[in-house]
């Protein structure tokens, strides 16, 4: 008799030659390849029940029909895996359970030696799956539970998540929507335990495309996303009522956009990395309007501010303050043109007031300080030093009345040494205190009339012995 031929794997096909034994008689037969069959035969072929062993460790015990493994039995494989269940044509077929060498199991439907149909699998990793299979892979509807508590309930194709499904993560995060190649892809909704919700397009497991993101505190963004971040055009509505509509990049406001605060403040212009930067226009809550360039959310560079009261400033800005060269118009009363720092005149500048007052010279912290020239409404002109906005130091005053003075000043008043010329032609040279002749001085009325001596509150108290005309 010839030896039998065996094919191993998930399926077995056995064809043994006739043995010439009586049907249903239990016989033991060893073949040339070392395999052994012990069981019943019929018409010279294995039939009924029997056990077949191969030298490599394979063993089958169960039903046989006309030389084939058909019916119910148990197969143990060389790698330690074993199958208990139904067979057809030498292969698992019908209902059965396979326990693999690594401890994984499959319990369910088999077709032609492959896991196909409904079944349940447990894996060495601790994961489990219940649902459809095709050719040993998850296919159709099924539920996968991972060791960390993550659960997927939905469609599968060729072993991967594909189609509509629901993914529940261990922390309570829930995704419901479309899957492709095992990851969220297409339209889907993600709900997180902290209240964050995204509803929109996905690609390869990432938020990509158009969608709506609602933050836990109520902020809502509707627009474009790229790899989980806001990118492209969108509208962000804050819980407090503020609104931004424009472009984003890397999850920040970037490019052209308009921000409107609930208090009425409005900015329309360029943004960089979430900040106002570049050309734009800001309308403030009080009605003031700035048009120009920005940096770090502040006016910076060149720009014009029109205030609610009608005042304007046009010129250079630094970090939100007027700084550099510019022109400021304060209501209808005065105009300043020149240098500024920290929002105030600083350096050289010219101030013109509606009443005719003009000052041109040095400034410090918004006050006249240093050398300058002031022309007053009555036509008087002062040229000299200033301090804290007042004439202070050396200076010359000329008036339309004929009075003139050259000398020292203190806190806006003639004080110190100087020469005063009066409308009548008199000339006083000497000391002053508080605008009056005080101390040593000489008053010349004419070439031959001089009053010289000690003065007090404008009057000569003690004439010098050599004085004439007193």
Positions of predicted regions on the chain:
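Conserved anchor residues at repeat-unit boundaries in beta-strand-based tandem repeats, strongest
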Residues: 36-46, 59-70, 82-92, 105-116, ...
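N-terminal secretory signal peptides that target proteins for export/translocation
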Residues: 1-2
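Signal peptide processing junction and immediate N-terminal pro/mature segment
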Residues: 18-22
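Terminal, low-structured helical/coil segments at or just beyond the last alpha-helical repeat
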Residues: 446, 451-470
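Bacterial N-terminal signal peptides
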Residues: 7-17
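N-terminal segments that cap or nucleate solenoid repeat domains
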Residues: 23-59, 469
